[in-house]
Amino acid sequence: TRNRTLFPYTTLFRSQAWIAIGLFLGTVCNWLLISKRLRRYTIVAGNSMTLPEFLENRFHDKKKVLLSISSVVIIIFFLVYTASALASGGKLFHTIFGIDYHIALIIGAAVILTYTFMGGFLAVCTTDFVQGMLMLVGLLTVPIIAFALVSGKFAANIDHTQVAGGYDAYMNLFMNGGRPYKFVEILSQLAWGLGYCGMPHILIRFMAVKDEKELKKSSVIAISWCFLSLVAACFIGIVGRAYLVDNVLTGGQTESVFITMIERVFTKNIGIPFVGGLFLCGILAAIMSTADSQLLVCASSVSKDIYKSFIRKDADDKRIMKVTRITVIVVALIAIVIAWDPESSIMGLVSDAWAGLGSAFGPAIVLALFWKRANMPGTVVGIITGGLTVLIWDYIPLMGGKTLAVTTGIYSLLTGFILSLFVNVIVSLATKAPSAEIVAEFEKVDAYSE
């Protein structure tokens, strides 16, 4: 389970560390609480292949209301999510080679499309492992070398950059810009962890595992990988400011701090540019491993959940594959348009997409797996509430020309998740209870878990 492109988080320690903590806690909960039960329920609920299909089978939605709504939500937010990955690739090539951002964006998209076409889900899972290892080595090695180069001047360099509050405040987890963190700020950053239980491209891996025994081994590897990579990402943010003391990155440039560190360490300090190139491939690996999953999930929602379910019910595998490939191309093109602005914030795009998917599907999945009384009306309203809350919170100026996200300082995922969960429970209790057959399936999963 990769960390959904780490590089927006590898900026300044004081502004991102709580997000890293939230992501780690979310990863642990996802693997220990969600993975095994979702795998078992997937078998009971007709061996579902996608998240919308699982929800449809879980609640016996013969009219396919859940399927259609879930697919639309996935397509909307995955377009933004995919755009963030493509924007990362564009900025990577632009920074390293000086290539025009727009050309770099197109090149990166072409590479991702090529191997997604060639291997589909198998290629995605295989490349995930290789890319993940390369990225982890880079994340661990570069900040350690950079720290060794400035270790004797670390505190002095931090103070020299005139960071708010000085060195002591910069290194204090509870300080932000020279002032104490507000509780709502910490809570909002920790809330990133809630998103994991609603991420379709993560959950389908639990659903697709061949043997449940593999989940235990995989959970150890995934949690360990997550811990190491997030600690390294924060370390990059801490060391980066001291190491780049004569060229402190500000604004949107902070998203390229890792790239800049690699270039300087292996060209100016050590003089082994080849090794630096390998680690830059680690950044590209993170981008690729995120984008390919996003493209495939979005394409599956269109080809299987919409096309086969509503447009061509008798479609064979060959036709579905054709629709999938066409969808991948269309999604990539739209994502390129969204990411076309060189000044677009990768962190902003990731944040919006993560919040939308987490708010819409997180509560729905948790209740579907663990609450016997959950029903289809509650799940439908909950998904819509979560998705709309994020869109309204982040994009519609309601107070003095500002959005609620700006006015309150609260991350939309926290608000959307809570509202979606609350509405789901209330509507489920206020409407007809699940049928005896649905309850029997739930109890079958319970018995299987004992």
Where are these regions (language model features)?
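Short, small-residue-biased leader/transition segments that mark boundaries at the very start
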Residues: T1-F7, T11-L12
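Transmembrane helix-loop junctions in multi-pass membrane proteins
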Residues: P8, F78-L92, T116-L122, I236-L244, ...
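Helix-loop junctions at the membrane interface of multi-pass solute transporters
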Residues: P8-T10, S35-V44, N57, I74, ...
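Loop-to-helix junctions at membrane interfaces in multi-pass transport proteins
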Residues: T10, R14-I21, E56, M133-G277, ...
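Helix-loop-helix module between adjacent transmembrane segments
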Residues: W18-T116, A191-G193, L284-D292, T324
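Loop-to-transmembrane helix boundary motifs in multi-pass membrane proteins
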Residues: R58-S68, S303-E343
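Terminal cytosolic tails of multi-pass membrane transporters
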Residues: R312, L398-E450
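Central hydrophobic cores of alpha-helical transmembrane segments
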Residues: G378-T389, F442
